[in-house]
Curated annotation (Swiss-Prot):
HAMAP family: Ribosomal_bL34. This is Large ribosomal subunit protein bL34. It comes from Leuconostoc citreum (strain KM20). It comes from the Bacteria. Residues 1-22, 30-44 have a biased composition (Basic residues).
Length: 44
């Protein structure tokens, strides 16, 4: 059985990246929450 996580840089960026987060209102909420929490890394 193959493993479920087969990492790809492009997919990671496109699905979880900063620009993807900024493109939707809910994504911006995610970033705002992570800023409020003081996360060093906001997105992939």
């Amino acid at each position: 059985m193959k493993r479920t996580y087969q990492p790809k840089k492009r997919h990671r960026e496109r699905v979880h990246g900063f620009r993807k987060r900024m493109s939707t209102s809910n994504g911006r909420k995610v970033l705002a929450r992570r800023r409020a929490k003081g996360r060093k890394v906001l997105s992939a």
